[in-house]
Design a protein with these regions (language model features):
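Non-heme Fe(II)-dependent double-stranded beta-helix
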Residues: 1-113
């Protein structure tokens, strides 16, 4: 990624320090509410068509073009680049779906890879 094209979502030194100390960074307004709503609609359509497959499916960015768009979104890539540098590979993607009223949770975690 060419650093001449970085947007305002490129992480600040303070955000980088927070990430290195805590293993996460939030909030990070990367995609905006319109794209988030569009993506939710697409996830719901996919879930209605294929049942609970999205909860089990891995590497969604390989077979869903709209998921690949999220993975390749410049704001997301710029934030990741500021932490690990420009050599970025999406190893996996997955939906963690928890509908309202469902028991259970998806815990916070820090990847070790």
């Amino acid at each position: 990624m060419n650093s001449k094209h970085l947007s305002s979502n490129y992480l600040t030194p303070e955000q980088n320090i927070f990430y290195k100390n805590n293993g996460y960074l939030a909030p990070l307004p990367a995609i905006g509410s319109m794209l988030a709503e569009e993506t939710l609609s697409k996830i719901e359509l996919f879930e209605n068509k294929y049942g609970d497959f999205p909860q089990k499916g891995l590497k969604a960015h390989l077979y869903l073009p709209w998921m690949e768009e999220i993975v390749r979104h410049s704001n997301i890539l710029e934030a990741v680049e500021s932490i690990i540098g420009p050599d970025i590979l999406c190893w996996s993607s997955r939906f963690f779906i928890k509908n309202p009223g469902e028991k259970g949770f998806v815990s916070w975690h820090q990847d070790v890879t």
